[in-house]
Amino acid sequence: MKGFTGASIIVFYLIKGYLSYIIFPNGYVCDFKFNPLVNVLPSINTTGDIEEVGCTINNPSLSDYIALVCPKKNYNDYEHMEKVPSKCFSSNLYSPYKSEDSAHKLEELKIPEKYSISKDFSDFDLNIILIPSLYNIDKTIYCRCDNSKTKRELIKNDGENIKLQGKLGLVKIILNNQQNSPQNIYHITRSTQVGSLDNKVIELKEGEIVHLKYDGKTRTNFNCKEIINMKISIPLDYNLSMRMPTVFLKDINCKFHLIFSNVGGIANIVFKAKKTENIDGCDFTVPKGKGLYKNGFALSEINNDEEICTVHIGRGQNSNAAGLKCPYNLTPAHCFKHVLYEKKYKNGNNVFQTFLLDDVLRTVDIEYYYNAKLSAHIVGIPTIPEKSETVRCVCEHDGKKGIMELKISSSKNIFISFILLSIIVSIFYLF
């Protein structure tokens, strides 16, 4: 199973016609055995305190899956290994350090137990939880892979003894993007009339989730290229969910159909939406209130060497998307994929350095758009981050700098494996 240490592979093939403009379910692996960055092997411990490693998954959705890889107990490096709860993720903890006796069954979260998958291997356990498309949860759940009671001594050549202690691996899953009363649920029925032109027309809005429920096995010719960065779930229990992107780059009028495999007949579906207007952002080519984005200013007209254009998105804001137009020198060159983020040091000498926005927000659930002809960049944040963050991109021309400062508000003011997805698909399609 060294494939778990392999790099990220994003593969999805369930429905014919899925193309690169679709975002597929994300996979998150908390690998406490094979990943050298977070393994729980005994290491040098001079403080006596337990060293904690782990991963936080913030609001997974639409068939995203989380996998825990935990070493099995043995007489060497994992002598006192303990997985808590022992049946994770079929049961879970609401506090990170409670005991097995405090575990809660998955059904208490109103997630069916079949969404939890377990597989034993010779030297490790694999536990997977699949996040359903519809849920009403406001909880943070935990599972532990605890090797902290394993202690060893390493004798060096000079006779010195070095104390080694295992680490505590912690999985934290935040589930608070719930839908109290799920909307946009459409029951799709078949039409048996030959040549039928009846259509199910669905009006779309930015960021909303559309749920298609149908009876029986189906296949589709889905091919809506106009909708870029739409996230789509694994079709489970005759339910297919689609999250619309944070922006529509053009008017949408897309038709596709579901073909009912067993009983015959088709269902025609039409998606419609208006192009997103008035995206908040900074246009550094024209005066404020004009141009592609309304909050910028013309660099040639500013009095100082630099000025800041601030944009707010996220919780409590009107939008989860922001734009930037800069046909000049842009830093980082691939804004927003890369951003300037203030690195804080204990001595107070803070400095802005280049980071991946994925790393700053601790999520891969981010939408990126770029129009080379217009020198226009757009970023969309469909999932509210765990923490509020501020990032920058700098547009420079003739000695003048326009600084776009993007403030992303939170709700609280990664290895992806084809093997894991294959396991999920094979198990769920047995039902």
UniProtKB/Swiss-Prot annotation:
Domain 6-Cys as annotated: residue spans: 26-178, 278-413
Keyword Glycoprotein: yes
Pro-peptide region(s): 410-431
Phenotype of gene-disrupted mutants: Strong reduction of female fertility, while males remain unaffected. Gametes are unable to either recognize or attach to each other.
Glycosylation sites: N45, N239
Disulfide bonds: C30-C55, C70-C145, C88-C143, C282-C309, C326-C395, C335-C393
Lipid attachment, kind GPI-anchor amidated serine: S409
InterPro entries: 6_CYS_dom, 6_CYS_dom_sf
Signal peptide positions on this chain: 1-20
Pfam families: s48_45 (PF07422)
GO cellular component terms attached to this protein's record: cell surface; plasma membrane; side of membrane
Keyword Aminoacyl-tRNA synthetase: no
Record keywords, A-Z: Cell membrane, Disulfide bond, Glycoprotein, GPI-anchor, Lipoprotein, Malaria, Membrane, Repeat, Signal
Compartments, as annotated in UniProt: Cell surface; Cell membrane
Purpose of the protein: Required for female fertility.
Name by which UniProt lists this protein: Female gametocyte surface protein P47
Underlying gene: PB47
